[in-house]
Amino acid sequence: MASLKEVKTRINSVQSTRKITSAMKMVASAKLHKAQGAIENMLPYQRKLNKILTNFLSADLPVESPFCVERPVKRVAIVAFSSNSSLCGAFNANVLKMFLQTVGEYRELGQDNILIYPVGKKIEEAVKKLGFFPQGSYQKLADKPSYDEAAALAKLLMELFLEKNIDRVELIYHHFKSMGVQELLRERYLPIDLSAVQNDEERGGVVNDYIIEPSAAQLIADLIPQVLSQKIFTAALDSNASEHAARTLAMQIATDNANELIQELTKQYNKTRQQAITNELLDIVGGSMA
């Protein structure tokens, strides 16, 4: 059985850890509140913008967009979103798992034809360990999502796609649903996927309600870059909010575990102390009878 001093030292150590996890939980909770507000304000706009675009592109109009062109995939770009720091449960591990699965599907293209754009320190480090060369560092975008940085990344991807330097772009990120639920998504970014609206009863309905000037082609040309830039920004906001939610939950669980451990150690301390007192009394009684 451990001595009183050893048990007391363990109790103090766990109490110190509990203070840290509790403080980290409060910080993460505050950041989550801010990030949640940003994503909740942005999502309706992004979804509406995307719906307008898909309605235009899928309507019976004599318009074609180069961003919708399907071609054989010879070169692919993968944009994966993670966090810059750890202590957020399985958040980064899940991103890495899906990233490895995605890379595995394109392995036959050859490593030189798989371009990786890591948004976040953790996925960037993992990419380097796997032997890939990251196409830039976007840690700031993961920590504090900025529309300007997101738009710059989107512009780069669009240019590469138009120049046929890449044939497909995929996104891997967490979608924030609630404090306890963050859904890991893998989405095709380019070419634009219209399959989701093929069976939409309202397909093309929005277009018929508008007079398009100067032309549908010009409107789509102006709208697509905005939608694609907004998509990267929204994914960054989604990932950021999901990270803080995962960290808040992880620190809450760690704090609860610390409380349980302190209770168990306190019981052990009291039991050990009681046993020590009993032994001393027995020694005293035994000495007086000798």
UniProtKB/Swiss-Prot annotation:
Alphabetical keyword list: ATP synthesis, Cell inner membrane, Cell membrane, CF(1), Hydrogen ion transport, Ion transport, Membrane, Transport
Membrane topology: Peripheral membrane protein
The keyword Transport appears for this protein: yes
UniProt keyword annotation of Transport present: yes
UniProt subcellular location: Cell inner membrane
GO cellular component terms attached to this protein's record: plasma membrane; proton-transporting ATP synthase complex
Pfam families with a match to the protein in the record: ATP-synt
GO annotation, biological process: proton motive force-driven plasma membrane ATP synthesis
Single annotated GO MF: ATP binding
PANTHER family the UniProt entry points to: ATP SYNTHASE GAMMA CHAIN, ATP SYNTHASE SUBUNIT GAMMA, MITOCHONDRIAL
Protein's job: Produces ATP from ADP in the presence of a proton gradient across the membrane. The gamma chain is believed to be important in regulating ATPase activity and the flow of protons through the CF(0) complex.
Subunit structure: F-type ATPases have 2 components, CF(1) - the catalytic core - and CF(0) - the membrane proton channel. CF(1) has five subunits: alpha(3), beta(3), gamma(1), delta(1), epsilon(1). CF(0) has three main subunits: a, b and c.
UniProt xrefs under HAMAP family: ATP_synth_gamma_bact (MF_00815)
Family recorded in the similarity comment: Belongs to the ATPase gamma chain family.
NCBIfam families, alphabetized: ATPsyn_F1gamma (TIGR01146), PRK13426.1 (NF009959)
Protein name: ATP synthase gamma chain
Organism of this sequence: Bacteroides fragilis (strain ATCC 25285 / DSM 2151 / CCUG 4856 / JCM 11019 / LMG 10263 / NCTC 9343 / Onslow / VPI 2553 / EN-2)
